[in-house]
Structures are given as structure tokens and as C-alpha cells.
Amino acid sequence: MCIRDRFFIAPDDSGYYYNFECTCIGRLLVGFRREREHATHATPRVMESILRNPSLGPRPFPEHEGDNRWSVVLAIPPQALFMHSLTDWSGLKAKVNLYKCGDKLSQPHFLSWKPIAAPKPDFHLPEFFEQIKFSEI
């Protein structure tokens, strides 16, 4: 079974972005990249700084039918954007998109917060990220 939530963020206009991919049981991958194929992955120290709370618990399980509601709460510190020197999120302007990917399920599905105008599902397209501003603290 493979269900992933993804958070993509470009904190500046360099063309690079971070992608945070988290499974429904809290397994996490963090990469910094300009394109899908070439990424610099976060160190174990960065990975440990990201708190995860999966509603389904941390153990793998087979796909099942019925009530499939779940959530994963991530607490991502600004330092997790490890190629930047952020110390807080306050007032940061960035471009982001959020996704849900169930590509290896018996009924594959893909969702995004903002639409992606591509012929097939592809989340690694920063041109479809949306500008946001984090609240001032």
C-alpha cells in the first residue's frame, strides 16, 4: 500500500523547491531540488527535527476497504528547509502546493490543493505552486 501526502514549498524565486513526502504511517522523505530526478536529501538530523503524528500509527499494514479516513500531523521547523537559513516562518512569502497520492492502490487517485494543468499527474511542477504568506507573529 502506498498513500502519500506531499507538501512542496519554494521559499524564494531561485527555481529550487523542497518536497516533503509523508506516508499515512508517518514515514517521511525530504528533498531539495530543481527537478524531479536530481535531489539533495535531508540529513538524519533534519529528519529527526520534523515531528510526525499519524492517526493510523507507525506500523505498515495491507490495503483494506471500508472507512479509510486518516491524518498525519507534521510539525516542520523552518530549519528543515536545510539549504536556506530560516529561523522562523513569520511573514515568509513562498510558493506551495499540497498533494495526496495513492498511485499504487487498487484504485489509484491523485489530489492537489491547486490545479495542475499537465497531461498526467506530476507534482514536480513549480509553475503550479501558489503564492502564500505565513502570518506575522
Task: Specify the residue positions occupied by each region the protein language model found.
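Structural preference for beta-rich elements and adjacent junctions enriched in aromatics
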Residues: 4-137
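Phosphate/diphosphate ligand-binding glycine-rich loop within oxidoreductases
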Residues: 1
